[in-house]
Design a protein with these regions (language model features):
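Glycine-rich phosphate-binding active-site loops on the catalytic face of alpha/beta enzymes
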Residues: 1, 44, 50-64, 113-129, ...
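Short, ordered loop/turn segments at secondary-structure junctions
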Residues: 1-2, 26-29, 59-62, 98-99
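Active-site-adjacent beta->alpha loops and helix N-cap segments on the catalytic face
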Residues: 1-20, 34, 63-80, 102-104, ...
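Glycine-enriched alpha-helix->loop->beta-strand junction motifs that scaffold or abut catalytic
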Residues: 16-21, 50-53, 88, 108-115
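Hydrophobic faces of well-ordered beta-strands that scaffold small-molecule active sites
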Residues: 22-26, 55-57, 93-97, 114-118
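Active-site mouth loops of central-metabolism enzymes
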Residues: 25-39
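Catalytic cores of alpha/beta
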Residues: 35-48, 98-112
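C-terminal helical cap(s) of enzyme catalytic domains, especially alpha/beta-barrels
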Residues: 67-82, 109-113, 124-161
Length: 161
C-alpha cells in the first residue's frame, strides 16, 4: 500500500489515540522496488517521530529480493551498515528475517539482541539457542565479532539519553 506521509502520520496518531501500540513498516513486497538507504533511514525516523514503538524493515515471507536481501536471500551488507549507522539505535527496528542463514548473519553482525521478525515457528528454538550462544555454528563468529556488536550496542545506548 502506498500511503502518503500525512496519511501514515494520521493513522499512527489515530491508533495511539485509541490506546493501541503501533509498529510502522518500511519497504515493499515488490521485488522490483529496492530500498534506498537514505530514504529508509528517513522513513524509520518518521515512523518513530510519529509515535511508532518500532519500525519493521520488510523482508517478505521468502526473505528474497526485498528489504536488505538480494534475490538469493543474502544480506546486502552495505545497505545493512548504512541503515544501522543512519538509524544509530538498531533496537528501534525489527528486521524481517525468515531464513535461518539471515538470523545467523544478523546475530553475528548486530549482536544477540537484534529484533527479528517473520521467524518461522519451527526456527524459534534454534534462533533463541543461537542468541544465547548455545549453537556451535555461530558461537565462534559471535565471539570474533563481539567488539563490533558491543560497539553498536554502546552507540545505541548513548543515544538513549
Amino acid at each position: 500500500i502506498d500511503l502518503p506521509r500525512k496519511d501514515r502520520k494520521h493513522f499512527i496518531k489515530q491508533a495511539l489515540g485509541e490506546g493501541f501500540g503501533v509498529l510502522a513498516e518500511i519497504g515493499k513486497k515488490d521485488t522490483s522496488i529496492k530500498i534506498e538507504p537514505a530514504r529508509a533511514v528517513e522513513q524509520v525516523f518518521e515512523g518513530l517521530e510519529n509515535g511508532a514503538e518500532k519500525v519493521i524493515i520488510e523482508g517478505r515471507d521468502s526473505g528474497k529480493g526485498v528489504g536488505i536481501y538480494n534475490d538469493q536471500g543474502t544480506v546486502n551488507d552495505q545497505l545493512l551498515q548504512d541503515l544501522v549507522q543512519g538509524v544509530q539505535d538498531h533496537s528501534r527496528i525489527i528486521i524481517e528475517a525468515p531464513q535461518t542463514s539471515q538470523h545467523n548473519y544478523l546475530l553475528i553482525h548486530l549482536g544477540p539482541n537484534v529484533n527479528l521478525g517473520n521467524v518461522q515457528p519451527h526456527d524459534v528454538l534454534t534462533l533463541e539457542s543461537t542468541r544465547v550462544g548455545l549453537r556451535g555454528d555461530t558461537l565462534k563468529q559471535c565471539l570474533i565479532n563481539a567488539p563490533r556488536s558491543f560497539e553498536l550496542f554502546a552507540m545505541s545506548r548513548n543515544n538513549d539519553g
